[in-house]
Amino acid sequence: MRSLLCAPLLLLLLSAGESAVITGACDKDLQCGEGMCCAVSLWIRSIRICTPLGSSGEDCHPLSHKVPFDGQRKHHTCPCLPNLVCGQTSPGKYKCLPEFKNVF
């Protein structure tokens, strides 16, 4: 009975409230433009948004390296840009760093 009384109030609050439009929402990488991936939102974990690939010095996840990825990403970071690698900078910390090939 109590829920029946609360329902009209809830509808009134929902209809009078402001709504938000999330631009760039996605489910998979293929829905994002070139140079982006579909990553978990930092603010609302149940939403994924198109996010730029990691630039030099930005945080990354060592197991996230394929673009486009066929499934749903579990992290809020995208893989690094093609000329960068996700390298460990300290215990548990990874950043996009220049790829040092043919150094010698």
Curated annotation (Swiss-Prot):
One BP term from GO: endothelial cell proliferation
Pfam families per UniProt: Prokineticin
Location relative to the cell: Secreted
Predominant location: secreted
Keyword Disulfide bond: yes
Keyword Secreted attributed: yes
Tissue: Expressed by the venom gland.
Similarity remark: Belongs to the AVIT (prokineticin) family.
PANTHER family, A to Z: PROKINETICIN, PROKINETICIN-2
Protein name: AVIToxin-VAR1
Species this chain originates from: Varanus varius
Lineage: Eukaryota, Metazoa, Chordata, Craniata, Vertebrata
